[in-house]
Amino acid sequence: MNNAAKRWIAILVAAAVLIAVAAYAAFHFAVQALKGKVEEALGPAGEVAAIRVADGGVEIIGLRIRGDGAQGAWPAEDQLRAERIVVVPDLRSLLSSRVRIRAITVEGGYLSLLRTPAGRLRLLPSLLERPKTDGAPGPAIEIGRVELRDSALEFFDASVRKPPLKLRLEQLNASLDRLSLPDLAGKSKLDLVGVLKGARRDGKVSLKGDIELASKDSVLTTQLRGVDLVTLQPYLVKATETGVRRGTLDMDLKSTVQRHRLRAPGSLTLTGLELASGSTFMGMPRNAVVSMLKNRNDQIKVNFTLEGNLDDPKFALNENFATRVGASMAEGLGVSLEGLAKGVGSASSSAVKGVGEAVGKLFGK
């Protein structure tokens, strides 16, 4: 090899090294700029620990929106947080005009929601209650799958007591397929499972079906199994002198939402319900009268239908005649089966609606 050839090879190698260094520097600058943009979008209460490249995509570490950024008192330390978010792009979309993201995975996520004494749902107030600014809509983006792993959701209900009742869902794993941004149009398949924490025992929660985040239309099947009635006591017990000592709840709900109107036939089963002692009804111990409502399996079963407007927290509960007789006797005992069905049913509906609004706001709706 002559000297000229060697010189050209050296020049090409040096140029390649310089290009690689320049590309790395440019990419590092772009990642740091992205970190600043994300923090700006989250608002003054938001922060991001780091953004880097990993697992064939972009990794966001330590995303958080503090609770002190909310207008008025917020019942939780954080509005939102995520230990790790991985965004994996579809490289084939680089050659097209539409951006496609293959998957977004959130690990160690957390979201808090508050229902006010007036029944209004609040979540991510730092984002959703921020004054709107005029601006061009974001680019069209298609997301194949959003997945939530080992996350938690806390629902604070100030409409039933003060301080607010806290319901905590842990070990939350969920997936949402087919998401179009920024319009959120089209049906997405939702699959969610989690554990509802209780004072005496933990119950299981399952939610499956289709939802359109833009219109909030949905067809969902909700199942609760072995949920602690002590935790749900504010929904179940109306009389101040009555308390719940033990018991569990199973519930099945098939809900349909069209144009913000909900219709959800369902059934609930109370197993092993035992009220606090020391109170009577018509001269008899309340637990003795409760026993009269139970079947041979120590259960009280109720069929019901929730109907109403999602924008109105007050839902109508319709029951058949036989159920009304049992419910009327329960009302006299200071036990509200209607309140339990309304409270748990509307809480799950509010949570789904709230998460939909959160997704829309976070992704630029």
Show which residues each predicted segment covers.
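Extended terminal
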Residues: 2-12, 210, 223, 242-244, ...
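N-terminal amphipathic/hydrophobic interface segments
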Residues: 10-72, 108
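Amphipathic hydrophobic-ligand
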Residues: 41-44, 71-89, 101, 128, ...
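Secondary-structure transition motifs
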Residues: 61-176, 270-287, 310-324, 357
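Short beta-strand micro-motifs enriched in acidic
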Residues: 88-94, 114, 177-182, 210-212, ...
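Outer-membrane beta-barrel architecture
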Residues: 99-103, 145, 189, 217-219, ...
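Elongated, acidic membrane-bridging lipid-handling scaffolds
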Residues: 128-233, 308, 313, 319-320, ...
